[in-house]
Amino acid sequence: MIKKNWMYWLFFLALFLAPFYLTEFRLSLLGKFLCFAMIAIGISLIWGYTGILSLGHGVYFGLGAYCMAMYLKLEASGGRLPDFMEWSGVNKLPWFWKPFEQPVIAISSAIIVPVLLAMFLSYFTFRNRIKGVYFSLLSQAIVVVFVTLFIGKQEWTGGTNGLTNFSTVFGFSLSSPLTQIVLYLLTVVLLLSMFLFSRWLTRSRFGRVLVAIRDSENRVRFLGFNPTTYKVFVYSLSAAFAGIAGAMFVLQVGLISPAMMGIIPSIEMVLWVAVGGRSSLIGAIIGAIVTNGAKSFFSENYPDIWLLFLGGLFIAVVLFLPNGLTGVYQSVRQRKKQGEVRANEASSHVLQRVSRF
């Protein structure tokens, strides 16, 4: 297995060694991109393998991020009310904030809250056989609801500014280079774990059923399987990945706001997977890193046109790269193999003719 997939291991080894060859700023940037790659793996599972196009995964990312940010904000406040609550005239910490004084609850909630929402949403939609563009529109409607709620309840969520100004995590300074390296390495470990688990899942019997659902859901139902169960599970799993990504994002970037969980970020998440190749887990990771790396480059050097670049990239992928970057790579490998086979056939044919003489 190691021999066959040596490129995967080399890729993750390069990620592990990044603290030795990247500056502190670039390492922080890469850590953020790897958080996005976690989301991309989940979207690849539901879109590439199961045929569920979700345009609302920003919500699950945001919920995971807010759960972690609530703990960080309370820790930074040092027993006092968070500053935005004081500015809004709140005199007492809301009851749903109190559990987040405990880090264990904050970490577990970053996974449980997105999963519960995903299970609730997916069960009722998939049970009623809502799919395709209708599910995509419904997922975007959920985004609008949550963004509006988070902006409107400023005294609870910080409004449009979100939650910021975190100083420590578990007593360690977030500005410390050592803390940032530890958080980065933890992100790599989590990403690798998600990749390996998803790879095992897609190659199992469960994964084959997911692909069958994507290709012909009615036939799967006719064979005695319940597609709703499979779709709810994989959709909830992708929400868990997004929630974990949100929690790690907050720890490394130091802020979260409703704008980061809105419609545009949710669509961008799908774009990452499309660029890398929606039916490839490693392609989803590469797509997230490449797209966000290019976005960072253009926003730094050409701030006036980076949105045009993003739109142009999406159009180019749809028109010319329907299978993404990994599709191009696989196509090149396939042609190379075919060329080798033809060359071998030609050489053997020549040898046969020579042997006759």
Short names for language-model regions:
Residues M1-F357:
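Transmembrane alpha-helices and adjacent helix-loop boundaries
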